[in-house]
Swiss-Prot record:
Active-site residues, as the UniProt record annotates them: C82 (nucleophile), H170 (charge relay system), E172 (charge relay system)
Gene3D superfamilies: 3.40.50.880
Family that this chain belongs to: Belongs to the glutaminase PdxT/SNO family.
Biological process according to GO: glutamine catabolic process; pyridoxal phosphate biosynthetic process; pyridoxine metabolic process
PROSITE patterns: PDXT_SNO_2 (PS51130)
Summary of subunit composition and partner proteins: In the presence of PdxS, forms a dodecamer of heterodimers. Only shows activity in the heterodimer.
Catalytic reaction equation(s): aldehydo-D-ribose 5-phosphate + D-glyceraldehyde 3-phosphate + L-glutamine = pyridoxal 5'-phosphate + L-glutamate + phosphate + 3 H2O + H(+); L-glutamine + H2O = L-glutamate + NH4(+)
Gene that encodes the chain: pdxT
NCBIfam families, alphabetized: PLP_synth_Pdx2
GO cellular component: cytosol; glutaminase complex
Residues holding L-glutamine: G53, E54, S55, R108, I134, R135
Keyword Ribosomal protein: no
Pathway this chain belongs to: Cofactor biosynthesis; pyridoxal 5'-phosphate biosynthesis
Name under which the protein is recorded: Pyridoxal 5'-phosphate synthase subunit PdxT
Length: 192
């Protein structure tokens, strides 16, 4: 059995919980999906999903709770969406706490402010996916070994590095479980 933790410090936690639970059920795998609020809870999961929200607040709370240290020390696979993408970076256009798990530079709010939010069909992993972009970041540059999975309007919106996945958009707000399934399959390969 694997345990997937949804970081529950701030952001759209319930949407990720529901989507991840639905995904493991559809996949027919033995998995538990739980909220992670403390370093102790972070130590009990095989992977963590960091949702959208306010990246500065989430980063600060991850430091205060010790969750950041657990993720880094125990090399937990992480999927970060929107604010989670920002937190996975090792550099951003704003001074804030970061995990630094992916060699990339991210620009916060690259697609504009809240009123500029939009939805678009994107190509990712050889298929179409409905992307929901809310004050979305974008990757400005990636280091060696970082795989670019998708671009939109010449901006990088999805990358993978090892067992870590960063998405500029919100797959948890749609109906398609494809990207959650992709991440869970990666986790299964990483924890074997």
């Amino acid at each position: 059995m694997i345990r997937i933790g949804i970081l529950a410090l701030q952001g759209d936690v319930s949407e990720h919980l529901e989507m991840t639970r639905r995904t493991v059920e559809e996949m027919g795998i033995d998995a538990e999906v739980v909220r992670v609020r403390t370093a102790e809870e972070a130590s009990t999961v095989d992977a963590i999903i960091i949702s959208g929200g306010e990246s500065t607040v989430i980063g600060r709370l991850m430091e205060e709770t010790g969750i950041k240290d657990v993720i880094i020390r125990e090399k937990k696979p992480v999927m970060g969406t929107c604010a989670g993408m920002v937190l996975l970076a090792d550099e951003t256009d704003y001074e804030q706490p970061l995990l630094g798990l992916i060699d990339m530079k991210v620009k916060r709010n690259a697609f504009g402010r809240q009123r500029d939010s939009f939805e678009d069909e994107i190509d990712i992993l050889g298929r179409k996916f409905h992307g929901i972009f809310i004050r979305a970041p974008a990757v400005l540059e990636v280091g060696e070994g970082v795989e670019v999975l998708s671009e939109l309007d010449d901006m990088i919106i999805a990358v993978k590095d090892g067992c870590n996945l960063a998405l500029a958009f919100h797959p948890e707000l749609g109906e398609d479980t494809g990207l959650h399934e992709y991440f869970i399959k990666e986790v299964l390969n990483c924890v074997e």
